[in-house]
A protein has these predicted regions:
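Alpha-helical transmembrane segments and immediately membrane-proximal extracytoplasmic
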Residues: 1-461, 467-469
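Hydrophobic alpha-helical segments, chiefly the membrane-spanning helices
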Residues: 472-476
């Protein structure tokens, strides 16, 4: 870290380091994130092409075959690389808080590949969690190749920021979200390289890829009379987020207790195919379904069915082992809940534009509680809607949702996963560092023992000060 009396030469070298790390990780992280997203879309598109013109049963069987193939692929990856478990955003957070521990980049790349297989096959999982962890692994790998005076957590944070920025096209939100959810601080030393990575990743996307923001919405003026409805939606979003997260953890614990991973994967694939035959919107990432909600193209009953189906499908897929993220499903659930709230608001006499506003607000409220980044999610809303009014409504609902979910569940889904593994980030980084140190490592064997005679001498021999006092005349 530079001091106030830093020489111009040292300052120049530090700036070069910051720019180098930020640009390299921004380019690599942006490329990796875009390739992942486009890869999922390309493979899923090939599967959907085979389903065109088929009967509902035939199309369902094609999707089931793809999911079964994905289940075998995931199981094969885990066995081939001897993975004890899949890694995800929780490991990226833990890696940033344990800079002295080696970051498991290899496991990160393998886990991202498994998530690619799962999402491409049509499992109800998210893509941004794997992309986030992929970015963190890229950052850690860059540090292994090009170490500098920057700390390891900054490399990880740069990779995450690049991935988020490329995925959403929201560099400001990426910087804040990383500082809020990954680093858990806003230190100046970290902001510069993270910002460079986020902006470079955003710039890389249009240069090399034909991609736009995954969600599209037309902002409209906000009726501030909706604020009580927004507060109520925030409370409902917290309850939905808690149900979602608890269901995921309990299903995963149940599946693990059975100790038959392949059977659980095949069961997840079969159940997902059945749900998809009944509610096609629940299949895969659900990006188009969310855009349909944002456009107001669903009926009340359809949105309610989509919410229930997506909740069940995601719990089945992730809980039973089809690896993937939780952010996209959280956005889907929040959009469905907000859409329902919008219909209620219209019934209470508000303008039809309330449906769009509350759909966006619901997305932010549920996602903010699940990933533990309320301000970052609000900024994502602001950047993809370009609406100050939408952002204000979102921050009100997100604050209410996060307030409730933090007290009734945990700071985020990832924090709860870490607590289950014995890592409580609320205790601080010092606590995590002490967990890595064994008391036995501090034991000193070369101790000189004190005999009984030496102890008597030490106890009975007067100190020089006592002898001096004994020679002093009494004042009496």
């Amino acid at each position: 870290m530079l001091l106030l009396n830093t020489s111009p030469k040292e300052l120049g070298l530090e700036l070069v380091r910051v720019l180098f790390v930020g640009v390299v990780i921004g380019i690599l992280g942006g490329l990796a994130a875009n390739l992942f997203v486009l890869g999922v879309g390309a493979i899923d598109g090939l599967i959907r092409e085979q389903m065109v013109g088929q009967s509902a049963l035939s199309a369902g069987l094609i999707r089931w075959a793809a999911l079964i193939a994905g289940a075998f692929g995931i199981y094969g990856l885990k066995q081939a690389f001897k993975m004890d478990r899949w890694h995800g955003p929780a490991d990226a957070i833990l890696g940033a808080h344990r800079p002295d521990a080696p970051f498991p980049a290899r496991e990160g790349f393998i886990s991202t590949t498994a998530a690619l297989v799962s999402a491409s096959a049509g499992a109800s999982v998210g893509q941004y969690g794997p992309v986030l962890h992929f970015g963190a692994s890229v950052g850690a790998q860059v540090r292994a190749l090009f170490p500098t005076r920057l700390t390891p957590d900054i490399y990880v944070a740069c990779g995450v920021a690049a991935a988020i920025s490329a995925g959403f096209g929201a560099p400001i939100a990426a910087v804040v979200l990383v500082s809020e959810a990954i680093l858990r601080h806003f230190a100046v030393r970290a902001v510069a390289p993270i910002t460079v990575s986020a902006i470079v990743a955003t710039a890389v996307t249009p240069l090399f890829f034909d991609r736009v923001s995954p969600y599209s919405v037309t902002a409209s003026p906000t009726d501030w009379g909706l604020l009580p409805v927004v507060l109520g939606l925030g409370a409902c979003a917290a309850i939905l987020a808690i149900v979602f997260m608890r269901s995921l953890l309990r299903t995963a614990a149940w599946a693990k207790s059975l100790n038959n991973e392949l059977a659980m994967l095949l069961l997840a694939a079969t159940l997902m195919a059945l749900i998809g035959m009944l509610v096609p919107e629940a299949v895969g990432l659900g990006t188009q379904s969310v855009n349909d909600l944002l456009a107001g193209e669903k009926l009340f009953g359809e949105a309610a069915l989509m919410l229930v189906a997506k909740l069940g499908a995601t719990v089945v897929c992730i809980g039973l082992g089809l690896v993937g993220g939780v952010f996209s499903p959280a956005l889907f659930l929040g959009a469905s809940l907000g859409y329902l709230a919008g219909y209620v608001a219209v019934g209470l006499g508000f303008d039809s534009s309330a449906v769009v506003i509350l759909t966006v607000v619901g997305m932010a409220a549920v996602a903010g509680s699940v990933i533990g980044a309320p301000i970052g999610v609000v900024l994502i809303v602001f950047e993809f809607t370009r609406s100050y009014e939408f952002a204000v409504a979102a921050i009100l609902a997100v604050s209410m949702s996060s307030f409730i979910s933090t007290r009734l569940f945990c700071y985020s889904f990832f924090d709860r996963q870490l607590v289950a593994r014995g890592f409580d980030l609320r205790q601080g980084r010092e606590f995590l560092s002490l967990k890595d140190i064994s008391v036995a490592d501090l034991d000193v064997e070369a101790v000189e023992s004190v005999t009984e005679s030496m102890a008597c001498l030490l106890y009975t021999s007067p100190s020089p000060r006592d002898r001096t006092r004994s020679r002093m005349p009494s004042s009496a």
